[in-house]
């Protein structure tokens, strides 16, 4: 299964509360924080929802 590194590129101040919960589910709380995830259908949906706040790199 493919792995990706997800980095929060923009601040979560002033965004929709549901998007903030999605960031927390991804393990991201602060700007510049990164986490490694396995690419799953659930993760793809989360990345599509809050992609405007993130930078995604394939490993």
UniProtKB/Swiss-Prot annotation:
Keywords: Ribonucleoprotein, Ribosomal protein. InterPro entries: Ribo_uL30_ferredoxin-like_sf, Ribosomal_uL30_bac-type, Ribosomal_uL30_ferredoxin-like. It comes from the Bacteria. The keyword Ribosomal protein applies. GO terms for cellular component: large ribosomal subunit. One of its GO terms (molecular function) is structural constituent of ribosome. One of its GO terms (biological process) is translation. Pfam families: Ribosomal_L30. Gene3D superfamilies: Ribosomal protein L30, ferredoxin-like fold domain. Belongs to the universal ribosomal protein uL30 family. Part of the 50S ribosomal subunit. This is Large ribosomal subunit protein uL30. The lineage of its organism: Bacteria, Pseudomonadati, Spirochaetota, Spirochaetia, Leptospirales.
């Amino acid at each position: 299964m493919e792995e990706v590194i997800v980095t929060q590129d923009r601040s979560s101040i002033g965004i929709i509360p549901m998007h903030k919960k999605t960031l927390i589910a991804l393990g991201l709380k602060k700007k510049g924080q990164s986490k490694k995830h396995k690419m799953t259908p659930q993760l793809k949906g989360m990345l599509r929802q809050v992609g405007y706040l993130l930078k995604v790199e394939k490993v």
